[in-house]
A protein has these predicted regions:
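FAD-binding core of FAD-dependent oxidoreductases
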Residues: 76-93, 112-128, 155-168, 190
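Amphipathic, small/basic residue-rich leader segments at the start of a protein or domain
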Residues: 1-86, 99-106, 110, 115, ...
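Beta-sandwich/jelly-roll carbohydrate-recognition scaffolds of carbohydrate-active enzymes
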Residues: 106-110, 120-141, 157, 177-184
Length: 200
C-alpha cells in the first residue's frame, strides 16, 4: 500500500493493528470474538474503503483495495473475507452507485464506521451469485396506508456476515401484476435495503 498520503498511512496502520490483534485467530468468523473483530474493523475504517470521504469513508483505488485484501488474506483468509465483502458487493456499493442523497446520508457513515454491518442476500438454494438467475420474487402492492410496498418471499443460503449483519441488501425480482408502478418505472431485478428487526 503506498504511503504517500495521510489516508493511506491511516489505512496501513489500521490494517497492521487488525492483523496484530486477530491475524492469529483460526476461526474469527463466526467465532466468539466476532463482535470485537467487527468493532476493530469499523474503528480502523476498514469497512469504508469504497465510500467517499463526504460520507465518512476512506475511499481508495481498486488497486489499493486489492493490496489491502491481499495483505490481510495472506495472514488470515477469514479476516480478508470479512473486510472484502462490505467493500465489494452489497449495501455499500449499491448505495454509492444508486442510492439517493437521503439514503446515502442515512446509511453510508454508519457503514463506514461499522455501526452497521452489511450483507448481501443474493444466493439461494436454486441459484448462485447470479442476479439474473432464479432469484426470489417480490410483488408490488398497496399497504394499509395506501403506499406502494413490496411483498417478498425469500429463501437465501450462504450469505457471508448474515448472522451478524445489521443491514441486508436483498436482491429480488419485482413483479407488478396490478400495474401499480408509475409508467416510467419498470419491474424487474432490484435491491431492497432491510435493517435488522424489520417487521415481517
Amino acid at each position: 500500500i503506498k504511503k504517500n498520503t495521510s489516508r493511506n498511512m491511516a489505512i496501513e496502520t489500521g490494517l497492521n493493528k487488525l492483523i496484530s490483534n486477530w491475524g492469529h485467530i483460526q476461526t474469527p468468523y463466526p467465532g466468539k470474538y466476532i463482535n470485537h473483530i467487527l468493532k476493530d474493523i469499523g474503528e480502523n475504517k476498514l469497512f469504508s474503503l469504497i465510500i467517499d470521504e463526504k460520507y465518512g469513508g476512506n475511499k481508495i483505488s481498486t488497486t489499493q483495495l486489492s493490496n489491502v485484501l491481499t495483505k490481510l488474506s495472506s495472514h488470515n483468509p477469514a479476516l480478508g473475507v470479512m473486510v472484502m465483502v462490505p467493500n465489494s458487493l452489497g449495501p455499500g456499493e449499491l448505495l454509492v452507485k444508486y442510492g439517493n442523497e437521503s439514503q446515502k446520508k442515512q446509511y453510508l457513515s454508519k457503514l463506514s464506521d461499522g455501526s452497521l454491518v452489511p450483507c448481501f442476500g443474493l444466493t439461494g438454494p436454486n441459484n448462485g451469485s447470479d442476479a439474473l438467475g432464479e432469484i426470489d420474487t417480490g410483488v408490488i402492492f398497496k399497504n394499509k396506508n395506501n403506499e406502494l410496498s413490496i411483498r417478498v418471499k425469500i429463501n437465501k443460503r450462504y450469505i457471508t456476515l448474515a448472522p451478524v449483519a445489521d443491514l441486508i441488501g436483498l436482491a429480488i425480482n419485482v413483479m407488478d401484476p396490478d400495474n401499480l408502478l408509475p409508467s416510467d418505472v419498470k419491474p424487474g431485478v432490484t435491491v431492497a435495503l432491510l435493517e435488522r428487526g424489520h417487521p415481517n
